[in-house]
Amino acid sequence: MKSVLYSYILFLSCIIINGRDIAPHAPSDGKCKDNEYKRHNLCPGTYASRLCDSKTNTQCTPCGSGTFTSRNNHLPACLSCNGRRDRVTLLTIESVNALPDIIVFSKDHPDARHVFPKQNVE
């Protein structure tokens, strides 16, 4: 009977622990663990504008014009699209208003892309 009771308590504990919202995340050595972000555990296209602490989650902010990120990150800012062209593909397209736009595709992460007006990129 005791083993059934202990098993039941263990089972309920697992449900309670796994079923609850585990946010906010406690920092580990001053940094959040990998993938501890509020947007589906991902931060591509955003940067960590505020790292988590014991009371709040990491806050992700979208990258601005001419910048991008393609992976989960703890970066305090987005990367410039004018940087390492060997890792980034730039594609010019014609927009509806006939002004060319730039789409940035990361070779490491082809799903991550950012579109912005060409006039903002040199």
From Swiss-Prot:
Keywords: Disulfide bond. Induction: Expressed in the early phase of the viral replicative cycle. TNFR-Cys repeats lie at residues 42-81. Disulfide bonds join C43-C52, C60-C78, C63-C81. It comes from the Viruses. The protein is truncated in this strain and presumably inactive. It has similarities with variola virus CrmB, but the product is truncated due to several premature stop codon. This is Truncated CrmB protein.
